[in-house]
């Protein structure tokens, strides 16, 4: 009897264990009413309509039919591009997010159990975020030359730039570069600034000094950390051994620096001297021309009658010099004789008469008792009169009278300088008409002229 009872007890225990561990994956799960003051178990929900505790749907599924008092929830799988990530009792699955844009990268694909996740590409940050991933990306700020990155950008924040401090520089446009320190030089060719590094000159203090072999640390200090210090010490001894030839490059540089101002000064000075020389040559040429003009003007004789008349033509001067050889009394007698002779002659012969009258006035001795016929008394006087006819305009009128004096004391220099001056066609007739006795008398009355030897003897008392 004992073995039978043992087997019966084992069978009952197995049934109880099976009942206690029964799986709730059955399609028709019998809901239950919760006890007062208690809640539904895990992965269950309380339905307000049925007032029963019902089971939830697993991720990737949704509730197709809700539970009742007699039936449990009926679940169904999600469609494509939809998902449910948690235990739920929703009637529809959630839609996956839109595809990633060109500035985004898909880090998680869309499945029935998870949504699609997009993040920003490198160099971009998320300007508008969401629960998972980023909705809108923007490019990171790039710091321009002279500015460095103070705070680098992240997936959700932009870059912060700041100006480079003195002694540092940034010569790039970047969203990651920071300000770097200037290189240290013994001799600075171009000093550095916020956007440019310092430039070191190739001429070192070692070359400028005679005992240059002592300055071995030069290669390390001349270049910054970017240069290679290993080959520099090998070149330093060679530079120190070539010290006698070394000072030539600085001397050439200094000569080139001084050559520009010295050449400029010499060029300006030479140009000034050249201009002064040209001006002096022009002045000397003008000064040499003026005495020649004065000498040419001095050759023309100026008689007292010419000075009284002012500036007259050369023809008028030669016409007026005939008057001083006669006295005032002889001119009066000649004028009276011409007045008596004028009515007897016709008008075309007037120029010839006036010319002859002028010749008589020039050669007359001043006799006051001349005959009515116009024949004057000749006393030791020889008159040569050339009369031009007024009808012949092509001929040149000229008169030349020479008086031969009995007195040998008178020198040829005292006689008037008579020159034969050719006249134009119009002047031959016009001059003869203008030079009437009244004109001759008017010109001679301005200043008394000296009388000749024959005139002095016949001067009326």
Swiss-Prot record:
Keyword Hydrolase: no
Segments on the Extracellular face: 23-257
Cytoplasmic side: 288-461
PTM characteristics: Phosphorylated; mainly on serine residues and with a very low level on threonine residues. A soluble form (tumor necrosis factor binding protein 2) is produced from the membrane form by proteolytic processing.
GO cellular component: extracellular region; membrane; membrane raft; plasma membrane; specific granule membrane; tumor necrosis factor receptor superfamily complex
Basic and acidic residues composition bias: residue spans: 415-429
A Gene Ontology molecular function term of the record: tumor necrosis factor receptor activity
Disulphide bond pairs: 40-53, 54-67, 57-75, 78-93, 96-110, 100-118, 120-126, 134-143, 137-161, 164-179
Chain positions of TNFR-Cys repeats: 39-76, 77-118, 119-162, 163-201
Pfam families, sorted: TNFR_c6
Membrane-spanning residues: 258-287
Alphabetized UniProt keyword annotations: Apoptosis, Cell membrane, Disulfide bond, Glycoprotein, Membrane, Pharmaceutical, Phosphoprotein, Receptor, Repeat, Secreted, Signal, Transmembrane, Transmembrane helix
Comp. bias regions, Polar residues: 364-377, 404-414
Residue ranges, annotated region (Disordered): 208-254, 321-377, 394-461
GO BP terms: aortic valve development; cellular response to lipopolysaccharide; extrinsic apoptotic signaling pathway; glial cell-neuron signaling; inflammatory response; intrinsic apoptotic signaling pathway in response to DNA damage; negative regulation of cardiac muscle hypertrophy; negative regulation of extracellular matrix constituent secretion
Glycosylation sites: 30, 171, 193, 206, 221-222
Record-listed Phosphoserine modification sites: 330
Bias (Low complexity) ranges: 227-240, 325-337, 394-403
Oligomer status and interactors: Binds to TRAF2. Interacts with BMX. Interacts (activated form) with XPNPEP3.
The name this protein goes by in its record: Tumor necrosis factor receptor superfamily member 1B
Taxonomic lineage: Eukaryota, Metazoa, Chordata, Craniata, Vertebrata
Gene: TNFRSF1B
């Amino acid at each position: 009897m004992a073995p039978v009872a043992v087997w019966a007890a084992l069978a009952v225990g197995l049934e109880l264990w099976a009942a206690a561990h029964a799986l709730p994956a059955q399609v028709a799960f019998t809901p239950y009413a919760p006890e007062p003051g208690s809640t539904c178990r895990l992965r269950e929900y309380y339905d307000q309509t049925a007032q029963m505790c019902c089971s939830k749907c697993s991720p990737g599924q949704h509730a197709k039919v809700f539970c009742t008092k007699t039936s449990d929830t009926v679940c169904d799988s999600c469609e494509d591009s939809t998902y449910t990530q948690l235990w739920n009792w929703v009637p529809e699955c959630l839609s996956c997010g839109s595809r990633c844009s060109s500035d985004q990268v898909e880090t998680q694909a869309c499945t029935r159990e998870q949504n699609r996740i997009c993040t920003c590409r490198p160099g971009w940050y998320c300007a508008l975020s969401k629960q998972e991933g980023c909705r809108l990306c923007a490019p990171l700020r790039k710091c321009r030359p002279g500015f460095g990155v103070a705070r680098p950008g992240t997936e959700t924040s932009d870059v912060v730039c700041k100006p480079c401090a003195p002694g540092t520089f940034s010569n790039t446009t970047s969203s990651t570069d920071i300000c770097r320190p200037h290189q240290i030089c013994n001799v600075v060719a171009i000093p550095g600034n916020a956007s440019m590094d310092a430039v070191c000159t190739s001429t070192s203090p070692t070359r400028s000094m005679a005992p240059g072999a002592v300055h071995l640390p030069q290669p390390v200090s001349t270049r910054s950390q970017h240069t290679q210090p290993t080959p520099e010490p090998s070149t330093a001894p060679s530079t120190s051994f070539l010290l006698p030839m070394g000072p030539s490059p600085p001397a050439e540089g200094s000569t080139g620096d001084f050559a520009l101002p010295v050449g400029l000064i010499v060029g300006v000075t030479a140009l000034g001297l050249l201009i002064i020389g040209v001006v002096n040559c022009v002045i000397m040429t003008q000064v040499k021309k003026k005495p020649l003009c004065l000498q040419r003007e001095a050759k023309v004789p100026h008689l007292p009658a010419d000075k009284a008349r002012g500036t007259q033509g050369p023809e008028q001067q030669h016409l007026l010099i005939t008057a001083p050889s006669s006295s005032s009394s002889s001119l009066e007698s000649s004028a009276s004789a011409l007045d008596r002779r004028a009515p007897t002659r016709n008008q075309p012969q007037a120029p010839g008469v006036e010319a002859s009258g002028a010749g008589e006035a020039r050669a007359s001795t001043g006799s006051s008792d001349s005959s009515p016929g116009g024949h004057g008394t000749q006393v030791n006087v020889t008159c040569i009169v050339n009369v031009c006819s007024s009808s012949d305009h092509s001929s040149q009128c000229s008169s030349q009278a020479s008086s031969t004096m009995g007195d040998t004391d008178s020198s040829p220099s005292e006689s008037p300088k008579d020159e034969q001056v050719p006249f134009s066609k119009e002047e031959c007739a016009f001059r003869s008409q203008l030079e009437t006795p009244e004109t001759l008398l008017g010109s001679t009355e301005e200043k008394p002229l000296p009388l000749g030897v024959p005139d002095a003897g016949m001067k009326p008392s």
